[in-house]
Structure formats: structure tokens, C-alpha cells
From Swiss-Prot:
This is Acylphosphatase. It comes from Aeropyrum pernix (strain ATCC 700893 / DSM 11879 / JCM 9820 / NBRC 100138 / K1). The active site is at 28, 46. The keyword Hydrolase applies. Belongs to the acylphosphatase family. Residues 13-101 form the Acylphosphatase-like domain. The gene is acyP. InterPro entries: Acylphosphatase (IPR020456), Acylphosphatase-like_dom (IPR001792), Acylphosphatase-like_dom_sf (IPR036046), Acylphosphatase_CS (IPR017968). Keywords: Hydrolase. One of its GO terms (molecular function) is acylphosphatase activity. It catalyses: an acyl phosphate + H2O = a carboxylate + phosphate + H(+). Its EC number is 3.6.1.7. PROSITE patterns: ACYLPHOSPHATASE_1, ACYLPHOSPHATASE_3.
Length: 101
């Protein structure tokens, strides 16, 4: 609809869970690089199960959509089996994008 802002133009926050062969394949470093390229802030970390990566990203809706699409494939050695995304209220709490341990 004309005159109605879309989610793509809004500031949004998403919690992303990726499962599969996503640890030990440079997923976190590659995601950080992609997030910074897209102007997103937040963090990414491995989960202790050995097969999952969790991330929280904030930024423009179109950039968040792009990082979600990127997560479907990940870096070349990754094999994504499952992707879950939860939208959360934007908080603006991050400066930059970090890898958490």
C-alpha cells in the first residue's frame, strides 16, 4: 500500500538458530563479515550441542532479510539442515557485530 512503511524499511531484530554442519566451517566469522557488510549489529555464537549456531541481529528490515537468506546456505563448507527465525522488538543495544564464545 502506498504511504505505509514496510518491514523492509523498519528497524528490526531477529534471533536466528541454524542447525547442521555449521561449527568448524567458519560460519561465525563468515556471518560476522556478511553482517558488517550489510550494516547489521549483533552477535553470533556456537551452541554446546556441536551442531548449532545462534545469532541475534538488528538493523534495517531488508538487511535482516538478506542475512537470513545468507544463513540458509552459510559459507561454502557449511551444510544447513534447519533454520529458525524469531522476530523480536528492536532494542538498538549493539554497536558492531561480535563473535561470542
Amino acid at each position: 500500500m502506498e504511504g505505509v512503511p514496510s518491514v523492509r524499511d523498519s528497524l528490526v531484530r531477529a534471533r536466528i538458530l541454524v542447525r547442521g554442519v555449521v561449527q568448524g566451517v567458519f560460519f561465525r566469522a563468515s556471518m560476522r563479515e556478511e553482517a558488517l557488510r550489510l550494516g547489521l549489529s549483533g552477535w553470533v555464537r556456537n551452541l554446546p550441542d556441536g551442531e548449532s549456531v545462534e545469532a541475534v541481529v538488528e538493523g534495517r528490515g531488508d538487511a535482516v532479510e538478506r542475512i537470513i537468506c545468507w544463513c540458509l546456505r552459510g559459507p561454502p563448507a557449511a551444510r544447513v539442515r534447519e533454520l529458525r527465525v524469531e522476530l523480536e522488538p528492536y532494542k538498538g543495544e549493539f554497536r558492531g557485530f561480535e563473535i561470542r564464545y
